[in-house]
């Protein structure tokens, strides 16, 4: 059995330095790759990295070094001159980390008062910044060798446990996330309990670099960004426009088949309506505002208010419910420049957004219908998925009673139908609890995409009503629902999941037709016209380039099918097909090829 590196007591991780005789009533955490063990190992490795940096750069000062998903980071200043480290510096830091780990330093915990710690670190302005954020009371630091840093822990007992680690990337980070403050160095890393697990993680990192949607998006001519336009504002190129349009069209039909009505709300609404909805008080920092004719307006960060206004255009009866509205709504949210990341984190995006107005007795059935719809989508794109219920956050509107009713409605819908789910305490939207649909991609990474939210609050705030069977006015429940989350984010995830090998039914260009010479061009154009009849996008590669170069260009853009036409194909009305996704080459008649493409489209059922 491996050594104990920490304990868990009442759900809290406690290191061996802090257990203080409570071992008998605590659950041991062994040195392995369990989530609890990795949390302790990685947090300790962040301190080991800081110790190495301090050894190499004696004037370095450190801010914070928390765990993040799959690893850790540390924010620090190299020196007063503002020196920035790069990827080339990581090797030397790793080498020093290994030396320090092999020294087998005991890691000790030091407890004191906030005032005493402030005095100890009086010449360290970044430590003073950390102390400002710590409430009064006992404050702890951890020491190993000649290095000491403020920290709550938990840590491994000795640096000997820190053998299998990798520093993965360098970034910049504003002090405390405040864009008006200085930019610090940030180094990310990860650690494991054994060599094989670390090697597998590194393999996944390298594979993720190859699949990076920002890189593939350029290669496939899907989208781009322009600093003159602004950060976080993607520009969709023709290939990307076709991809989005196909996705939108498929989902449009799927929504209509399920009884959803298309609507559209304005993108700019008076601030008064955002005050009424609660967004002004609870979400203002994420919104953009402007003044028109002395009145304040807010650009919508969500589509819910617009759909409420659609609901209010008529008196509604219980016979009308559930009433399902949907919109590909363009929304804008303020994101700090440091967190913008390709299509994953943008300032403008479109949601596949829907709001369902229903009676309380209809909640469960509608949630189950939504989950079935979501399952169909994930199945067609080859994603595994799981669900998580997010509960009331610290900043929220509505009473605890209403929140409990809404949260229980979500749990009951999942429980009664055997769905497994996790709980994210405090992770709900400010107006209601939600089910998050988290998908797993080909690299086993988890992404939060779709969401289902139960909302009793906004119907109350906007005094929504319907007339029941007894001719009395009742309050409807509002279900917020987005299945992809946003088109931008979902497309980015899909590109990385498939390594750019997009499914045939949404590929921007589905077929490239390569005539060997001009003598075969008319036949190529005829095939392109036939494909358009089935809504299949094709391109005739007739540039004055070599045959091999035209084929390589199509392959680089990951076009699913390439057909080559020469004298034999023209004479026999056939095609020489290279099916990229099936990894086959074959000859077939034109009729057979057209049937094959139609079959590929018909395989998709949303």
From Swiss-Prot:
A molecular function (GO) term: metal ion binding
GO CC annotation terms, alphabetical: cytosol
Location of this chain's protein in the cell: Cytoplasm
Record carries keyword Phosphoprotein: no
Ligase keyword on record: yes
Region (Catalytic): 212-503
EC number: 6.1.1.3
Keywords: Aminoacyl-tRNA synthetase, ATP-binding, Cytoplasm, Ligase, Metal-binding, Nucleotide-binding, Protein biosynthesis, RNA-binding, tRNA-binding, Zinc
CDD domains xrefs: ThrRS_anticodon (cd00860), ThrRS_core (cd00771)
BP GO terms, sorted: threonyl-tRNA aminoacylation
Reactions that this protein is recorded to catalyse: tRNA(Thr) + L-threonine + ATP = L-threonyl-tRNA(Thr) + AMP + diphosphate + H(+)
Residues annotated to bind Zn(2+): 304, 355, 480
Names of the cofactor(s): Zn(2+)
Enzyme class: ligase
UniProt-listed InterPro entries: aa-tRNA-synt_IIb, aa-tRNA-synth_II, aa-tRNA-synth_II/BPL/LPL, Anticodon-bd, Anticodon-bd_dom_sf, Thr-tRNA-ligase_IIa, Thr/Ala-tRNA-synth_IIc_edit, ThrRS_anticodon
Highest taxon of source: Bacteria
Database matches in Pfam families: HGTP_anticodon, tRNA-synt_2b, tRNA_SAD
Cofactor detail note: Binds 1 zinc ion per subunit.
Function (record text): Catalyzes the attachment of threonine to tRNA(Thr) in a two-step reaction: L-threonine is first activated by ATP to form Thr-AMP and then transferred to the acceptor end of tRNA(Thr). Also edits incorrectly charged L-seryl-tRNA(Thr).
Subunit field text: Homodimer.
Protein family: Belongs to the class-II aminoacyl-tRNA synthetase family.
Protein name stated in the entry: Threonine--tRNA ligase
Organism of origin: Campylobacter curvus (strain 525.92)
Lineage: Bacteria, Pseudomonadati, Campylobacterota, Epsilonproteobacteria, Campylobacterales
């Amino acid at each position: 059995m491996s050594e104990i590196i920490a304990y868990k007591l009442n759900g809290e991780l406690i290191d061996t330095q802090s257990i203080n005789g409570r071992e008998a009533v605590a659950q041991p955490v062994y040195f392995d790759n369990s989530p609890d063990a990795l949390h302790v190992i990685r947090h300790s490795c962040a301190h080991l990295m800081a110790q190495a940096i301090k050894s190499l750069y004696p004037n370095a000062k450190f801010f914070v070094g928390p765990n993040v998903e799959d690893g850790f980071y540390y924010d620090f200043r190299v020196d007063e001159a503002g020196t920035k480290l790069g990827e080339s510096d990581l090797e030397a830091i790793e080498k020093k980390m290994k030396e320090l780990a092999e020294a087998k330093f005991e890691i000790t915990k030091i407890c004191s008062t906030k005032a005493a710690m402030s005095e100890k670190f009086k010449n360290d302005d970044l430590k003073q910044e950390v102390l400002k954020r710590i409430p009064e009371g006992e404050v702890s630091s951890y020491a190993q060798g000649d290095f000491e840093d403020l920290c709550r822990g938990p840590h491994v007992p000795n640096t000997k446990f820190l053998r299998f680690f990798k520093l993965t990337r360098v970034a910049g980070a504003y002090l405390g996330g405040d864009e008006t403050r200085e930019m610090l160095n940030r180094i990310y890393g990860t650690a494991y309990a054994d060599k094989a697990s670390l090697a597998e993680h590194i393999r996944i990192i390298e594979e993720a670099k190859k699949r990076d949607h920002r890189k593939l998006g350029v290669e496939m001519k899907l989208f781009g960004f322009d600093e003159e336009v602004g950060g976080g504002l993607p520009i969709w190129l023709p290939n990307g426009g076709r991809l989005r349009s196909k996705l939108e069209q498929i989902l449009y039909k799927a929504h209509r088949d399920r009884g959803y009505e298309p609507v559209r709300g304005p993108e700019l609404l008076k601030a008064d309506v955002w005050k009424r909805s609660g967004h002004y008080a609870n979400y203002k920092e994420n919104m953009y505002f402007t003044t028109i004719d002395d009145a304040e307006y807010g650009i919508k960060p969500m589509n819910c208010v617009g759909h409420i206004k659609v609901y209010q255009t008529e008196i509604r009866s219980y016979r009308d419910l559930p009433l399902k509205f949907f919109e590909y709504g363009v929304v804008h949210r303020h994101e700090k420049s440091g967190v913008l990341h390709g299509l994953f984190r943008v300032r403008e995006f479109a949601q596949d957004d829907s709001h369902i107005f229903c009676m309380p007795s209809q909640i469960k059935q509608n949630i189950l219908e939504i989950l079935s719809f979501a399952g169909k989508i994930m199945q067609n794109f080859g994603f595994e998925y799981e669900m998580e219920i997010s509960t009331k956050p610290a900043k929220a509107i509505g009473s605890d009673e209403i929140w409990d009713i809404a949260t229980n409605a979500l749990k009951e819908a999942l429980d009664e139908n055997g769905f497994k789910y996790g709980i994210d305490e405090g992770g709900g939207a400010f107006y209601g609890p939600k089910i998050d649909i988290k998908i797993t991609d080909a690299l086993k990474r988890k992404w939060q995409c779709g969401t289902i939210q139960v909302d009793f609050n906004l119907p109350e705030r906007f005094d929504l009503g319907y007339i029941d069977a007894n001719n009395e006015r009742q309050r409807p429940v509002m279900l917020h629902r987005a299945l992809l989350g946003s088109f931008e984010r979902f497309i980015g995830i899909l590109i990385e999941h498939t390594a750019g090998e997009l499914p045939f039914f949404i590929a921007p260009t589905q077929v490239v037709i390569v005539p060997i010479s001009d003598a075969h061009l008319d036949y190529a154009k005829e095939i392109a016209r036939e494909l358009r009849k089935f809504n299949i996008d094709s391109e005739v590669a007739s540039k004055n380039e070599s045959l091999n170069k035209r084929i390589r260009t199509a392959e680089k853009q990951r076009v699913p099918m390439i057909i080559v036409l020469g004298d034999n194909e023209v004479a026999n009305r056939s095609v020489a097909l290279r099916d990229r996704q099936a990894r086959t080459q074959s000859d077939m008649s034109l009729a057979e090829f057209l049937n094959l493409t139609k079959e590929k489209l018909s395989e998709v059922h949303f």
